[in-house]
């Protein structure tokens, strides 16, 4: 009986090691995965991928209407524009380290593809998980929060299109909502729609002009821009994939700080119907 218990324990340890060391399911698979297959692997933060040999084209008919579905944007690199210590130098983008590792991908975005008079296409974003709250850390230790988003994106291609292929690029602008909501209260209890009007050590200085920006909170909507370059096309399934580069402002602490300029690069996937 003693040996049987040892054998059972040994087999349990071996099974645990095999489970822990086994490869996670490939993110490019189109099969439906279970929760247990996804949990702890990071696949929920990955966009589907097309094979390297996908170099076809998707024919377009201007008399028909098209929809772009399942648009997924997976960031891979983050950069923040830093002002130099020397005024003679120009501001440069500095690479940042992602702190919110498993919650950075925009997914399931959909919208209409409309033909224009010059045979270009315009994509208008309508719905989807179109924002993610992200924080990156700069080499000096500073942490920069921002709302990675493509809300209300309107992007246009070059004119004279008869198909979607690897030469097609989308460029457009979008809205960047406030990182914090209007009901958020800062550590001193100040907010946009609730909280104190001011919170300073000396009440007589509450209306000081130097403190107005900190005391008067604002949930501002700013602007961003993005470009998407198609690199892979599967004409049989209507799938496209490629790379993107987005530029947008960072969090402003409800208007108390100047926004930093953030650049995001990564890969995208979508399906045309």
Curated annotation (Swiss-Prot):
Main location: membrane
Gene Ontology molecular function terms on file: oxygen evolving activity
CC per GO annotation: photosystem II oxygen evolving complex; plasma membrane-derived thylakoid membrane
Matches recorded under SUPFAM superfamilies: OMPA-like
UniProtKB keywords: Manganese, Membrane, Photosynthesis, Photosystem II, Signal, Thylakoid
InterPro entries membership: OMP/PagP_b-brl, PsbO
Residues annotated as signal peptide: 1-26
Membrane topology: Peripheral membrane protein
Gene3D superfamilies: photosynthetic oxygen evolving center domain, Photosystem II, cytochrome c-550 precursor
Subcellular location: Cellular thylakoid membrane
UniProt-listed GO biological process terms: photosystem II assembly; photosystem II stabilization
Role of this protein: One of the extrinsic, lumenal subunits of photosystem II (PSII), which stabilize and protect the oxygen-evolving complex. PSII is a light-driven water plastoquinone oxidoreductase, using light energy to abstract electrons from H(2)O, generating a proton gradient subsequently used for ATP formation. Required for dimerization of PSII and for binding of PsbQ to PSII.
Similarity section: Belongs to the PsbO family.
Subunit record text: PSII is composed of 1 copy each of membrane proteins PsbA, PsbB, PsbC, PsbD, PsbE, PsbF, PsbH, PsbI, PsbJ, PsbK, PsbL, PsbM, PsbT, PsbX, PsbY, PsbZ, Psb30/Ycf12, peripheral proteins PsbO, CyanoQ (PsbQ), PsbU, PsbV and a large number of cofactors. It forms dimeric complexes.
Name the record gives this protein: Photosystem II extrinsic protein O
UniProt source species: Nostoc sp. (strain PCC 7120 / SAG 25.82 / UTEX 2576)
Gene that encodes it: psbO
């Amino acid at each position: 009986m003693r040996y049987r218990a040892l054998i059972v324990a040994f087999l349990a340890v071996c099974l645990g090691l095999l489970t822990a060391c086994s490869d996670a399911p490939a993110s490019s698979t189109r099969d439906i995965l279970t929760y247990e297959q996804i949990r702890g692997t990071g696949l929920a933060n990955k966009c589907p991928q097309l094979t390297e040999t996908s170099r076809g084209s998707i024919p377009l008919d201007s008399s028909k209407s098209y929809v772009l579905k399942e648009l997924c944007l997976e960031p891979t690199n983050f950069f923040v524009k830093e002002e130099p210590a020397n005024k003679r130098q120009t501001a440069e983008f500095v690479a940042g380290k992602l702190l919110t590792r498993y919650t950075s991908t925009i997914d399931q975005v959909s919208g209409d593809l409309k033909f224009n008079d010059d045979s270009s296409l315009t994509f208008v974003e309508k719905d989807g998980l179109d924002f993610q709250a992200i924080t990156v850390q700069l080499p000096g230790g500073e942490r920069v929060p921002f709302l990675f988003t493509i809300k209300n994106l309107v992007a246009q291609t070059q004119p004279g299109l008869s198909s979607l292929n690897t030469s097609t690029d989308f460029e457009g602008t979008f809205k960047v909502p406030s990182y914090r909501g209007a009901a958020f209260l800062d550590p001193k209890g100040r907010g946009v729609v609730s909280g104190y009007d001011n919170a300073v050590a000396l009440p007589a200085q509450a209306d000081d002009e130097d403190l107005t920006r900190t005391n008067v909170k604002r949930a501002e909507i700013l602007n961003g821009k993005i470009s998407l370059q198609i690199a892979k096309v599967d004409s049989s399934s209507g799938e496209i994939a490629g790379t993107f580069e987005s530029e947008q402002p960072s969090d402003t602490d409800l208007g108390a700080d100047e926004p930093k300029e953030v650049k995001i690069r990564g890969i995208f996937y979508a399906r045309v119907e």
